[in-house]
Amino acid sequence: GEAVAIMSRTRYEWTGADFALWSAGAVPVPIYETSSPDQVEWILADSGAVGVIVEDAGHLAAVEASRPRLPGLREVWVIDQGDIDSLSQDGNDVDDADLDARRTALDRDSLATIIYTSGTTGRPKGVELTHGNFLTLAENAAEEISEVVKAAGASTLLFLPLAHVFARFIEVLAVTAGVRMGHSSDLKGLLDDFASFQPTFVLAVP
């Protein structure tokens, strides 16, 4: 049930970390990659995060600037420095029975994530969502648009920021419905990514 923050653009490692943390019984806390150091510090402190996964050296600097005021923050991992690969290797030493126990201890009422508001009216506020929140929404969507998500060879390209709840819904829907999912973080190159990946459908905000 410990909180671990993720601060990165939309990429495969974001989704991989999200599901890995869920499997370990942890609570992912997304942080927009554009967040200011003050916002980063507030979210890490308010959520009680014990660790944070960042994408690059710039994000690392934002975390390190406030680390002296975050006594509960024990670990910082940097995706671009290969830390996710190292974590995956370290995972080989974790007892499977321990992971199974963590997974089976979760149910639909268990806390899945804390998503922070934009903070336009003051400090960002943490919104707690359960695994049931995500699963019920994904299951209902899979039935309502089954002709799209359950079609043979269904695939989608995720380009929305994963710090936003709608993007998290899309990744859960993809896993629930067995949809192949790609990631794109470069809006300028998005059309090229569409041409390369050739998704059969896209979910996006207006």
Predicted features and spans:
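Short hydrophobic alpha-helices that are characteristic scaffold elements of the AMP-binding
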Residues: D18-A24, D46, H164, V172-T176
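Structural core segment of the AMP-binding/adenylate-forming
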Residues: S23-S88
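Conserved pre-ATP/AMP-binding loop-to-beta segment of ANL
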Residues: V78, V94-Y116, R123, V149-S155
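Conserved AMP-binding/adenylation subdomain of ANL enzymes
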Residues: L135-L158, L162-P206
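Conserved AMP-binding A3 loop
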Residues: A112-A138
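Adenylate-forming
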Residues: R9, V54-V63, P199-P206
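Conserved S/T- and glycine-rich ATP-binding loop of Class I adenylate-forming
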Residues: V4, L21, V52, L111, ...
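Conserved AMP-binding/adenylate-forming
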Residues: G1-P37, F159
